[in-house]
Amino acid sequence: MTTLQKTHEKTRRLVVAGMLSAVSIVLGMTPLGIIPLGPLGVTTMHLPAIIGAILEGPVVGGVIGLIFGLVSLYKAVSGGSLLAPIFMNPLVSILPRILIGPATTYAYRGLEKLTKKHALSIGGGAVAGTLINTAGVMGFIYMLYARQYAEAIGVDPATVGYTILGICATNGIPECIVAVVISVAVCLAVRGIGRRRK
């Protein structure tokens, strides 16, 4: 790879990271980050990190995930939600979001090597990124704040583990579906544009 190509690649990564970080902030700070789906609110706030990780790798995805986490932390500090004190802990609000990038990239690359099918690989990466976000956040809540979380949502602390599993299932499945549909569409479109320019 020539010096010019390396410079072009670094510039592209910076642009992609900047644009998707901006989208992540908008989704995090506005109602656009939640899609009403019947009685559920399906989050789309993790999608920029997933798309960045597929297009540009784990570092870019991790940086965008960090931005997502920082927005979540800011909202916890400035908001009056009953769950705000829980999300003030970076282990809950930030770490799982940073891990979206590596989880997505390595799942995507692994499937790409195995199947050679772009859409399937992107979809698998999107599922991995979504699951690490949901399982990471809810897992840390259970490990660190089970009783406090139970009191905040009004359930018996003895059964809060089952409640969290139920939330992971009822929210995680539609979030995975939405993530796959949007990520496949966006990533294939961006790659198609890139190939035409070459």
Annotated model-derived regions:
Residues 1-198:
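Loop-helix junctions at membrane interfaces
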